[in-house]
Amino acid sequence: MYHVVAATTNPAKIKAISLAFIDVFGAENCRIEGVDVDSGVPRQPLGSIETRTGARNRVMMARQVRPEANFWVGVEAGIEESMTFAWMVIENANLRGESRSASLVLPESILHGIREGRELGDEMERLTGVQNIKHKGGAIGVFTDGKLSRTSVYHQALLLALVPFHNPIYQISVQTTTQ
């Protein structure tokens, strides 16, 4: 059984991680555990590089907290220009898989607050009245009227980040021949 450490205690992220690992390895082969670790980046990461750094840092911290695990998973949401997205980073002892989620263009009413230094989740709570929205459907759920959720979008990106761990083509070593 794989011990999978989710570098988060956010239920929406843990559910996405669980669904992806179950899809790839089967429910009977996975045990998911969430741990509270720091991302090492601002609470609202700006830009792809800062956001991916946050996801990688989460994995690094989770490895320190649970070194005996088989997999460590970091998910970090960020904003780049006018879009929200997230980076997924998955590691085991030998490999790293990474993927970026789909992006959603945010309305100016949200971006204004972000430019003033507030988090997306705080702005969504202010405008919708839904408490702790980032642990639920998130901005994606609100703007798609529930057709998508933070969990469903992250689930797809996590499936892509898992590809190097199970697809045999990724295991082929490149050999060069000299003549």
From Swiss-Prot:
Mg(2+) binds at residues 38, 68. It holds the Pfam family NTPase_I-T. Its EC number is 3.6.1.73. It catalyses: XTP + H2O = XDP + phosphate + H(+); ITP + H2O = IDP + phosphate + H(+). One of its GO terms (molecular function) is ITPase activity. Substrate binds at residues 8-13, 68-69. One of its GO terms (biological process) is nucleotide metabolic process. SUPFAM superfamilies: ITPase-like. Coiled coil: none annotated. Its cofactor is Mg(2+); Mn(2+). Binds 1 divalent metal cation per subunit; can use either Mg(2+) or Mn(2+). Keywords: Hydrolase, Magnesium, Manganese, Metal-binding, Nucleotide metabolism, Nucleotide-binding. It is an enzyme of class 3 (hydrolase). InterPro entries: ITPase-like_fam, Non_canon_purine_NTPase, NTPase/PRRC1, YjjX_NTPase. Homodimer. Phosphatase that hydrolyzes non-canonical purine nucleotides such as XTP and ITP to their respective diphosphate derivatives. Probably excludes non-canonical purines from DNA/RNA precursor pool, thus preventing their incorporation into DNA/RNA and avoiding chromosomal lesions. Belongs to the YjjX NTPase family. This is Inosine/xanthosine triphosphatase. It comes from Pectobacterium atrosepticum (strain SCRI 1043 / ATCC BAA-672) (Erwinia carotovora subsp. atroseptica).
